[in-house]
Amino acid sequence: MSWLPKSPKARRRLMLVAAIAPVLAVAAGLTLWGLSDSISFFYTPSQAEAARPAPGRSIQLGGLVAAGSVVKHPDGRVEFTVADQDAEDRVLFQGDLPDLFREGQGVVAIGAFREDGVFEAKRVLAKHDERYMPREVSKALKEQGEWYGDGQRPEHQGDAL
């Protein structure tokens, strides 16, 4: 075998690398597989519509709670709509909503889409105060021109000041 190193020391080193490499590859693969359940991507309703995450895949859905969309059922279920400028998604949640949850406020729902396109949330996070919004939500809303925080005012085309 002419491609093997001639020195016994170099051959041992090559054999050691050849033995360790598959073990490290398997360890890395198992680590990534184990973490796959805890990885959750953030989407706004319009991004979720474009990306169409697989039903059952855990994601974070963020946007504003649409006015007039909150429906509380006697069995503890809550239905509401999370919206951005271009799209909206119906959300179902079983449990107690955060105290600061209300219409027109930023929210992040953690859960998955069902086969019928309804988002089933396992957790719902709301804003802390009037100035706070989760970084992902504020970034996405700023990109769409819908969020006006930090003293900004809406810019309307054709305004004469």
Curated annotation (Swiss-Prot):
Topological domain spans for side Cytoplasmic: 1-13
Superkingdom of origin: Bacteria
A GO term for molecular function: metal ion binding
Single GO cellular component term: plasma membrane
Protein name (record): Cytochrome c-type biogenesis protein CcmE
Recorded coiled-coil stretches: none
Family: Belongs to the CcmE/CycJ family.
Residue spans crossing the bilayer: 14-34
Functional note: Heme chaperone required for the biogenesis of c-type cytochromes. Transiently binds heme delivered by CcmC and transfers the heme to apo-cytochromes in a process facilitated by CcmF and CcmH.
Pfam families tied to this protein: CcmE
Annotated positions binding heme: 128, 132
Segments on the Periplasmic face: 35-161
GO biological process assignments: cytochrome complex assembly
Cell compartments where the protein resides: Cell inner membrane
Primary location: membrane
Keyword check for Mitochondrion: no
Keywords: Cell inner membrane, Cell membrane, Cytochrome c-type biogenesis, Heme, Iron, Membrane, Metal-binding, Signal-anchor, Transmembrane, Transmembrane helix
Topological category with respect to the lipid bilayer: Single-pass type II membrane protein
Organism for this UniProt entry: Phenylobacterium zucineum (strain HLK1)
